[in-house]
Each structure stands twice: as structure tokens, then as C-alpha cells.
Amino acid sequence: MENTPLWRQGWYQFAGQLASPNFGPRPSQAEIDLIVLHCISLPPGQYGGDEVQRLFTNQLDWNAHPYFKSIEGMEVSSHFYIRRQGELQQFVSCNQRAWHAGVSSYRGRNNCNDNAIGIELEGVDDTTFDERQYETLVSLCASIVQRYPITQIAGHQHIAPGRKTDPGRGFDWPLLQQALGLSEQFFPAGVLLKSLC
């Protein structure tokens, strides 16, 4: 893919860059057609620190909080992370395979990391998200849809049901769909019926 004013080798020019070592090449025939939305905060429910960035760059002090012992040794990443105030950071080039989906399947295809771009929102899956996060998310998703052949946007809960619950009931799917102007077919069945916020 050629570079554009907004994209340089899969790096989005409106995101702060903090490179993660946790990535690999996508399979040669993979088509980047899925956006997966997640939420995360470390420790859970606490916002504003740098623990998520440290996790994604393998620099988290496992002894800094009791919760961290339960995730000790994890090597994970996401392409993007949106803070509560809307700040956007990128950890992995979208042309590469980030490690965000885990064991997953969506619409007949397994291993969603192969064809997905992962976006983490700072938050927990039983609360709502900040308006500034939605503003950043809409802008980012619009740019991704223009750049890559995206046909699907789903939550971690949809690609790993029973194992994951994020971004959760507090995420406003109708808001995202309306702001992007995409058809219902882009989204998981049922999420656009009503806002659960």
C-alpha cells in the first residue's frame, strides 16, 4: 500500500506512536476487513495512568498492583488505544498483526488477529465511555474505512463470546453506526436495535 498524508506504512499520522514488540506479520493472503473494539484499564476501573501502555510494551511492573499478578507474563498489544479524554496512541502498524483478539471467530472465520485492526478504549465493560472517546473513535474508524477494505466492525465480545465481554453494555453502537454512516451489515446482529447506555 502506498503512503498517504494520513498513513505511513500503516501508521496513522494523528496518533501518538509508541511501538510495541508484540506483533507479527499477517498471513500473506489476509485481507484487513475487520475492526475489533475492546476496552481496558489497569488496574481495572482506574484511569489516567500509563499501565496500559506499559503492558503493551512489555514494561509493566507486575509487583506494582495485586491485580497485575493475574496477568503476569502476558504479551499483548492493540493497534490503537483511546484514552478517556480522547487522546489516541498507536502501538502496531495496521499492516502488521497485533495481538489483541486471542482465540476468536467471527462470521465464519477464525483467528481474527489475522485480518483485524484492534482498537482499545480506556474503560471497563460495565460503564459508559466519554464523548471525547467517541469523537476520536469515529474519526479513526472513518480513516481506517477509507484506507482498508473494512466490511465489519465488532466488539471483542462478538468475536470471543463466552470468553470476553468488552466493550460491553455501555458502548453506544447506534452512535458509532450513525456517525460513520455505514449500513447495518457492518455491525453485529442486534447491537443497533437500541442504545444500552
Residues of each region from the PLM?
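Residues immediately flanking
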Residues: C39-I40, L121, Q157
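N-terminal catalytic cores of peptidoglycan-degrading enzymes
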Residues: M1-N110
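Short, functionally important structural connectors and interaction interfaces within domains
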Residues: R83-R84, S104, L121, R163, ...
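Conserved, mostly hydrophobic/aromatic
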Residues: L37, I119, L137
